[in-house]
Design a protein with these regions (language model features):
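Short, charged/polar, low-complexity loop and linker segments
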Residues: 210-211
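Membrane-proximal interfacial segments on either side of biological membranes
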Residues: 1-199, 203-206, 223, 228-302
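Compositionally biased, intrinsically disordered linkers/stalks adjacent to structured regions
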Residues: 216-218
């Protein structure tokens, strides 16, 4: 077991040397640059680790406890718990630096009831991967598994990322989110402007620079939007929305969303009526009247 009050992970980052073309070979200038964390190949051990405070790339991680494995330059964390941005996080991770400017990683994370605005402001990777959080204030939870390549600045190479999981919205206020506000303007649905969203779980997958958003529904100001589609890490949109109208959402407006997050393009179709869904309940759902079903007529060939 290893215990520490303070660890600065940035000290393990690589440094590269570059030569100033205006100097001779004997006057090489050493320039410190950020590189990936390289773990020495000679280290081989397993331990239970705990630390009161860890500094890593502008993050402050507190009260870390977990199992740590180091072997031939590879780091593994198993069932590790810590506090970050005021919330408890559980994480398992696998990390290996192929060279000073490239590392591969894979991790599973579970963070419950955290402040989405604080996460956007303080966690660089969250800010890059969830840019819409810039316009959100409130509480969400995250369960996600993702892997890929980290480059020299310890940020992901986005086309390399692959994973999936869910974001659960407990209570969030969207302010100035251009997608919702553009839909609001196009459909005269004022309730969609700066909406309050609650009790929604959004499932997504990531592959080849694309975030795929599985269909999800929510209620806001009497409307019942249903959204699905894709967005890319460079902000492009290809999404569908059905805006269920008050009071029950049975009548809805189909909407096509393209363009970018900064400049969404909204296409509106004609109102349609949804088919009523009915879940089967043992002993409660009326049985089909078989006598009312017309017989199957078979075609005959003469």
């Amino acid at each position: 077991t290893v215990s520490s009050n303070y660890i600065n992970v940035d000290e393990f980052m690589s440094e590269t040397q570059t030569a100033d073309t205006n100097t001779t070979a004997s006057e090489l200038e050493t320039v410190a640059e950020t590189g990936v964390i390289v773990i020495p190949q000679t280290i081989d051990f397993k331990l239970n680790a705990s630390s009161k405070k860890i500094f890593f790339d502008d993050l402050v991680i507190e009260n870390l406890n977990g199992k740590l494995f180091l072997n031939q330059g590879r780091l593994q964390l198993q069932n590790t718990n810590f506090s970050l941005i005021g919330t408890k996080v559980n994480m398992s991770a696998d990390y290996y630096a192929e060279n000073p400017s490239k590392a591969v990683f894979d991790y599973t994370i579970n963070a419950t009831d955290f402040d989405i605005k604080r996460a956007y402001n303080e966690v660089k990777m969250f800010r890059e991967m969830a840019s819409a959080a810039e316009y959100a204030e409130g509480i969400v939870s995250l369960k996600y598994k993702i892997g890929g390549v980290l480059e020299g600045d310890m940020m992901p190479n986005y086309p390399s990322l692959k994973g999936g999981g869910e974001l659960t919205v407990k209570q969030v206020k969207m302010k100035g989110f251009k997608l919702f506000n553009a839909v609001s303007k196009k459909t005269d649905a004022e309730g969609l402007r700066d909406p309050d969203i609650s009790k929604v779980t959004i499932h997504t997958t990531i592959k080849n620079n694309i975030i795929k958003i599985e269909p999800f529904k929510f209620k806001v100001a009497g409307f019942r939007p249903k959204i699905q589609g894709e967005s890319s890490f460079d902000g492009k949109l290809n999404m569908k929305m059905r805006l269920g109208l008050p009071p029950l959402g049975i009548i809805g407006i189909p909407i096509k969303i393209t363009g970018t997050q900064e400049n969404p393009i909204i296409g509106v179709g004609k109102q349609t009526e949804d088919l009523e869904e009915k879940e089967y309940e043992e002993g409660k759902t009326p049985a089909i009247n078989q006598e009312a079903i017309p017989p199957i007529v078979k075609d005959t060939i003469n």
